[in-house]
């Protein structure tokens, strides 16, 4: 192998906040540096903060690392991989979806493991034997074989569950535009404590006696855009002191499913105060559990958060993590979760980024929500650099069940 053809994988130290100890991830691509040279791993003095399910903060001096191998980047040499320390090997672009397929192209070479990838490139893991690379250390592409589509909206139109505007028989659209935890016009259905927006729709009245004439939903070139922007002065007396208008869509009354894959393709807004999300809640209206397929803060659009919330042990816990990603405000990306009876896995642009065990209380049908919150303690309030409207552009939302493992699902709920 010619020295110039060898690519070595280099990582920069990064301090990350994650939601559960031992689930440390960041998105750090490999870089071509020409001729072979010694790889510098993350130093022992690079501290990392992690959160346990109980909320305690711990300092770790050896953060787990992800070694990313992408198609088209040539041969690679990786040093310092340690699965026992929760390091991961992420393989993108080679259509490798199962650990067995990766193990089939591994061979031991002395004290190293050589991975012969489809099309010719090889990856050498130095001082790592194949038996030291467990299935759990591999982050692969989403396996779409055996997936049966159970829900699809490409937003060529907007199917609104229009409560308050039509007789019951005409209200059977797909997307409900409030939480439904109070009456459709109640504050508890139109925002969450600490947030600064109201989730509006053309029927929304607030405390006024008639509709306020608001519509945060816009169809643009086959996408649904949810706009978050300052509330007009004329409606401020009627929206419980909130300062912004935005949108929420849910399948609470149209679709829920036990287990499966839930996916969205979207471009996210940039600017302090914006907080877009795609998530799942139980159809029986209990909480937790909850699966956050993604959450992003508008002032940190290169960081992606995922989490699974539970109260199975009596206390509210959250397991998941955050990771570095390309700027999510610049282009559309795919965000997905595969939720099964044993495990939950998150995917970004079709490649696994995180997994946790399925909590004991997460075995009942859940429905989908997508919303653009504005303001609050976590995203902060919009500032002088925030540009309005903030636009959460959704290309599609889809759901699948996996056969034959998943039980019958995709159940419908009456209005």
Predicted feature descriptions by range:
Residues 23-34:
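Hydrophobic single-pass membrane-insertion segments
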Residues 71-73, 81-98, 120-121, 128-131, ...:
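Acidic glycine-/aspartate-rich tracts in secreted/extracellular proteins
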Residues 3-5, 20-22, 142-415:
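GH16 jelly-roll
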Residues 35, 43-62, 135-149, 403-415:
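Low-complexity, Pro/Thr/Ser/Gly/Ala-rich linker/spacer regions in secreted
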């Amino acid at each position: 192998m010619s020295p110039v053809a060898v690519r070595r994988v280099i990582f920069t130290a990064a301090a990350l906040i994650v939601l559960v100890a031992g689930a440390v991830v960041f998105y750090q691509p490999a870089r071509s540096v020409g001729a072979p040279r010694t790889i510098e791993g993350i130093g022992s003095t690079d501290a990392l903060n992690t959160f346990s399910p109980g909320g305690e903060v711990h300092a770790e001096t050896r953060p787990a690392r992800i070694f990313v191998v992408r198609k088209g980047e040539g041969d690679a040499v990786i040093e310092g991989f340690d699965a026992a320390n929760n390091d991961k090997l992420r393989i993108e672009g080679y259509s490798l979806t199962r650990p067995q397929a990766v193990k089939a192209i591994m061979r031991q070479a002395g004290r190293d493991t050589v991975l012969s990838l489809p099309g010719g490139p090889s990856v050498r893991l130095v001082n790592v034997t194949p038996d030291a690379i467990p299935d759990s250390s591999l982050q692969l592409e989403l396996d779409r074989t055996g997936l049966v589509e159970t829900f699809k909206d490409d937003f060529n139109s907007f199917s609104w569950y229009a409560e308050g505007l039509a007789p019951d028989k005409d209200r059977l659209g797909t997307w409900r535009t409030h939480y439904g935890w109070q009456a459709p016009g109640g504050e508890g259905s139109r925002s969450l404590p600490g947030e600064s927006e109201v989730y509006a729709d053309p029927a929304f009245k607030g405390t006024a006696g008639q509709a306020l004439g608001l519509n945060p939903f816009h169809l643009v070139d086959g996408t649904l855009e949810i706009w978050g922007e300052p509330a007009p002065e004329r409606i401020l007396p009627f929206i419980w002191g909130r300062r912004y208008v935005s949108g929420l869509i849910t399948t609470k009354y149209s679709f829920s499913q036990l287990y499966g894959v839930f996916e969205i393709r979207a471009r996210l807004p940039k600017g302090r105060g914006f907080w877009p999300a795609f998530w799942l809640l139980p159809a029986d209206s209990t909480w937790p559990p909850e699966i956050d397929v993604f959450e992003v803060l508008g002032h940190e659009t290169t960081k992606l958060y995922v989490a699974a919330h539970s109260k199975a042990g009596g206390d509210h816990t959250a397991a998941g993590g955050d990771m570095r990603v390309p700027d999510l405000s610049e282009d559309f990306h795919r965000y997905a979760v595969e939720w099964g009876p044993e495990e939950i896995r998150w995917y970004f642009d079709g490649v696994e980024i995180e997994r946790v065990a399925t909590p004991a209380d997460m075995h009942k049908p859940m429905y989908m929500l997508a919303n653009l919150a504005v303001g609050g303690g976590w995203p902060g309030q919009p500032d002088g650099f925030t540009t309005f409207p903030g636009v959460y552009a959704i290309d599609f939302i889809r759901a699948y069940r996996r056969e034959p493992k998943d039980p019958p699902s995709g159940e419908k709920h009456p209005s």
